[in-house]
């Protein structure tokens, strides 16, 4: 069945509507005399004519509709999860303004004379010997 067969879909929806009105008891809907006995004769309340459908012939449509609903639900959840992960990863990275700010040289270092080392020591800086960098405590992370 393709989507262009609206008659079968209309029959299924009418049958579901009648079952709803009869509180789920549709056992009496197929009773009658004539060639359509046992074929699930469903009176069409909108047009006044009868549409025949074999019992259980349209059950796969209901299952298909439920499967499409759950597929859309799962797809939406996957997209929402992916979007939330991208937002978390974006928060982990420093903004470009902070990165650019860290690249600027402070004014005290820029005004220091690089040839004789004056300027930093005058402001209380410590001069390190070549190769004598302070050891960082193990496990210390930059936050």
UniProtKB/Swiss-Prot annotation:
Membrane association type: Single-pass type I membrane protein
Protein origin, superkingdom: Eukaryota
Primary subcellular site in the record, as a coarse category: membrane
Tissues expressing the protein: Detected in embryonal dorsal root and nerve ganglia, in the somites and in myoepicardial layer of the developing heart wall. Detected at lower levels in the central nervous system (CNS) and in developing limb.
InterPro entries on file: K_chnl_KCNE
One GO CC term on file: voltage-gated potassium channel complex
Keywords, comma-separated and alphabetical: Glycoprotein, Membrane, Transmembrane, Transmembrane helix
Record topology, Cytoplasmic segments: 82-143
Subcellular location: Membrane
One Gene Ontology term of the molecular function aspect: potassium channel regulator activity
Transmembrane segments annotated in the record for this chain: 61-81
Glycosylation sites: 2, 25
Described function: Potassium channel ancillary subunit that is essential for generation of some native K(+) currents by virtue of formation of heteromeric ion channel complex with voltage-gated potassium (Kv) channel pore-forming alpha subunits. Functions as an inhibitory beta-subunit of the repolarizing cardiac potassium ion channel KCNQ1.
Subunit structure as annotated in this protein's UniProt entry: Interacts with KCNQ1; impairs KCNQ1 localization in lipid rafts and only conducts current upon strong and continued depolarization.
Protein name, per record: Potassium voltage-gated channel subfamily E regulatory beta subunit 5
Organism: Mus musculus (Mouse)
Gene name tied to this protein: Kcne5
